[in-house]
Structures are given as C-alpha cells and as structure tokens.
Amino acid sequence: MPTPSYPGVYVEETSGGVRPLTVASTSTAAFVGLAERGPVSATRVTNWTEFQRLYGSFSSEGLLAHSVFQYFNNGGRQCYVVRVTRAEARTASVSLRNRAEEPVPGLTFSAMSPGAWGNTLVLSIEDGTEDPGNTFKVSVRRQADPAVVPPGLGATDPVEEFDNLTTDPGSSRFVSSVLDAESEFIRAVILEQNTAVQRGLLRGGGAPELPLDTPVTFQINVDGDGFQDVTLPEEVGTVTSPEAAATAVQDAVRALTRKKESTDAAAFTSFTCEAEGEGEEVRLVLRSGTAAPTSSVRVQPAEFDGAADRLKLSLAAGGRPEDGSALRRPVNADLVQIGDAAVQGDVTAVAPGIDGTTEVPEAMFAEALGRLDNITDFSLLAVPGIGTPAMMNAGMAYCANRPLRDVFYIGETRREDITPEQAAVFRRGLTAPNSYGALYFPWVKALDPTGQSRDPIMLPPSGYIAGVYARIDASRGVWKAPAGTEASLNGVVGVATELSDVQHGTLNPINVDVIRRFPQAGVVVFGARTVSSDPQWQYVPVRRTAIMLRVSIYYGIQWAVFEPNDEPLWSQLRLSIGSFMTTLYRQGAFQGASASQAFFVKCDEETTTQTDIDNGVVNVLVGFAPLKPAEFVVVKISQKAGMASG
C-alpha cells in the first residue's frame, strides 16, 4: 500500500475478491476416419484449406474429408482429426548412402504417414548454404501420378525446403528434429551403421597468394580447443611453392600446445597441412590429428594481419571446413523419388508406400478413439460413415468414460438404413445407450464435390450436425437445442428418405433424431434427444449444458487446490461459481424467473464436514434448472360466442 507523505490523492490496486470463471468451449469437434494421407495422431485443423494440405482432398478412402468440409461449411471453426489406416498400410521410404570412402546406408527419409501418397514425394539433397562442408539442404517436391510419369519427371517446384541440416543430434539443426517439427511431408532417421568419422579438415578456398608478406600470423582452432595465434617463420616470405607453404603451416601448428586438458594432444602433434591439386586448382588442406565426430579445424585472421585470407583459409576467403562427422551426411542427390523401387545410384533401400485394400474393421475405428485421450479442448465426437450400433456404443462409452466426461457423441445410422423401421431396429441395437450421444437419421444427399457423379451422392449427417451444433452454440448458446428451422443444413440437396409426420412420430419417442425437408425451411435437423432413457437427460442441450458447466467449473477453480480449507475458501468458491452462474442465467441459460429459482451454489459446513476437512476434501454443490426444448407446440382454438345485437 502507498505510504502517505504529502497531502493529496493516492491510488492503489486491490483484488476484487472474485476469481472469474471462463465458459468452456463447446463447439470444437473431433473426427475419426480414413484419409488419403496425413498424421495418424490427433491433429488440430482450423479450416478446410489446412485439412487439404495435411490430409488431402475428397477421395475414395472414406467420407472423412466430406464430413470435415461440411462441418466447416455449416459453422464449425476448428476440429481435431484422427486418421485411421488399414492394417497392411505401409510408409514409403528411401535410404541414401553416406559420404564415406566406403559408403554405407546413412539416412532413411520416409513419408510422414503411411499410404501410397508417399510414393509421390521427390527429394533433392545438396550442400547447405551457410556451412556447405558440414550441412546439407533437403528439398521436397510432389510428383505427378507415378503410374504414368517416369521418376524424376513432372516434379513440381519444392513444396518444402530445409537448409543447413546436420546429422549431429546435439545441433539445433539436427535433421530428424527439424523435420519432425516443421515438415508436413517427410521424416528422417539416422541409421545405426552410419558411424563414419574422419579427421576434421579445412579446405582452402583457392590457390594461396605466394609469396607472403612477413610477418605471417593467423589464428587456428583445432578440435574446439580455442583459437591460438600461429606465426610462420620469416623464411616463408620467400616461399613461392604451395607445398613449402603447407610445410610451414604444419610445423607451426604442431608446435602449439593444447589449451584444454580434454583436448587430445594428437590433435596438434599429428596435425597435417598438405597442398592438394595442381596449378590454379591447388588448395591447402589442413587436417586435425584426431579422427572423431567432434574433430575440426577453423582459421580466422589475426588482428591487423590478412595472412589467413591470402592463404585462402578463412571463411571469408572461401575456406570450407569439414568436421569429423561430415561423412555421415547423405550424398548429394537430385530428384530421388521416395518409394520408387526403380531408383538406383546412391539409394541403398526403398520401401514403397501402400494403402492396402482390405476393409477396415470397426474395432480399428473404436481403438483410434484412444488417440484423443490427451486432448482436452474438444467437446463433440463423430466417426463419419461408420454408422453401426457397435460403433455408436463404443463412441458413447468413450465419451461417458473420459475422466471429465466432457465430450458428446454424434451418431448416425447406416447408409442402407432408409426406412423408419430400419432406423428403429438400429436404435434397439444400442446395447448401452446413455445421455452422451444422439442418433441421427437418415443420410443426406449432396452434389459430388469431385464432379465424378452427375447425380447427388449420399453422405453421413454427422459432419453437418457437428457444424450445426457449433453454429447454434455461437449464435444462441449451448442451452439452445440444435434443431428446428434455425438448424438448417448447408450443402445438401435432399435427404435419403422423405419422412411424413406419422413416420416421424414413430421415431421421436424412441429417441431417434430425424433430419427432414420442409417446403419453407429446407433440410433441417428436427430432433434434439439423446438416446438415454433417463428423463432428466433426455434432451441434447441439457446434457451439453451440464458438460459445459462441469468443464468450466473444473478449470475455473483450480486455484482452490491447497488453499486453507475453511470458511474464507468456501466463501470464495461460492462467490466465484455463483458469479459465473449468474452471468449464464442473465444470458438465458437456465429456467426460472429469478436467479434463486434458476440455480444454487452451496459450499459450507454442511457440504464439507470436519471429516472431509481432515481428509483434505472440500465439497461444492451446484444445481441448475435446465432449459428444455418445446418439442410439441399445442395451440387450442375455440369459438367465441358472438354478442347479440341490440
């Protein structure tokens, strides 16, 4: 607080006492299904363009792409995608030799996910830009259809480029780490047999300028020992032969003493400098006396002396260092197609990508749900096109058994279920119905986005429905039923089955939510029931409102953990949660003419006994009066007797 020292006004910031709670998102969906390509782990996607970039577009690999497109088309903002692959799917890869004199397989580049799509990737390897002797650059291109275009022809411009990569795991540019973090197409693995080392060297950037003006001094760093001054004898001023200059450099460096005990003395005692090449192509080549991954040679000018530049050994003069591990880099290669068994040359192994042809069993889709276990910011789940009772049972069970029970499953009947009787049979096939799922019937008709069919195609409704959920949540709130004339479906031309009111009346009582077409409203969702038989949780908005409250309160009161368990804490909890509930009530989230009728928050000595306190437990009781949709609007019309005329 301020310390008053003069007459005037002092302003101090204080805590308001209320810790605000944030309303949890309720409209982020997760989709599980087959895709042309893409990661198999749960991956966030924020728009259709991003989905296409990661997973490909519409394909025969399933209806996942169609459903995600319609999710965004109907109001969805972001979603997670879990790609399922066939059991026999394989990842395309190619292994390249290292740069040793007796080369061995050095690196394996592979597509980032299984499938034949990886066979369209084309790689080019070249020296890195900043340090060409030790690093390399990888360019990734997409090939046209490999079935009709010869390898290496028709490749597009690079879709990705990664420069200055290294095989050193300790480097920030380690190839595997960089590709894992940044590439949308490829991964890389250093093979175990890639252990080649050499004596670290420095190759001059040109023929030395002889004779040299004396005195001749430059600085050298061998094996990371630190830079030291190297002074050549005065006789070097008369030397015109590169071989003689090389001998002078070698003798001077060998006379140095290591600065660090950790440096191998042989780095200096066995140091060599040779003149390699002839005529204008002659170069001085300096080599450390040790052969190890960290072996290296660096030269820089000494102060006020340009000898390093005249000897062409400095980086500015074109000197090119190659460290001991430089041989582990992949050989330079141009347009190597991943997965193409016909590729030869420096390629040591190829594995083509395979999609597989067998039908994916439902169990694989159910197992894939587990990849969402660590994702906490989604609240809707769908497995488009896999409409079976077993799949819906698995989906609802997954939602109900998540630790926070924070997800709602959007189910659908089978494509071939086109009659109300078949939909009823499907509903009766749900062996473990609960309030964490809703069943929608029938499928919808839409124009084929690929243009392959002139007639409308059949699509599962779950992607559309998830988009409607998101749209209604944003415009009206999660407590508004995602149904009615407001819940129109964008991107449809009809439904698989046109139902009458009588037929609809046979499905609504057994909690099958129907999609219908009306003359004025178009195709709309006209049902908002969960598949639960519990009247308390019969309606979709009631369950989803409860999910929203649970998640919001859970994350909003984390601050209370380890606070002193007494009335001050209880009062803060009542105040924070009560303020949150009041805000929702004012937005129309609950039933009741007053806040006291709409909800209550209780946290006191009745909810938290001394035994609870001794066990470290504080109990908060929150109740709310949910809004339930008006399914049946009954209008009674009667005649009013006319007044007698006088």
Residue map of PLM features:
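Structured, hydrophobic secondary-structure cores that serve as assembly/anchoring elements
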Residues: 1-103, 107-112, 131-133, 141-144, ...
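Extended, Lys/Arg-rich, non-catalytic nucleic-acid recognition/anchoring regions
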Residues: 94-95, 99, 103-200, 269-271, ...
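Short, charged, solvent-exposed linker or helix-capping segments at domain edges/interfaces
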Residues: 120-122, 296-301, 633-635
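Acidic, small/polar residue-enriched beta-strand/turn segments
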Residues: 144-182, 259-338
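Detector for intrinsically disordered, low-structure N-terminal pre-sequences
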Residues: 148, 174, 221, 229, ...
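Intrinsically disordered, low-complexity peptide-like regions
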Residues: 161-162, 353, 404, 432
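Long, low-complexity, polar/charged, intrinsically disordered or flexibly structured peripheral segments
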Residues: 326-365
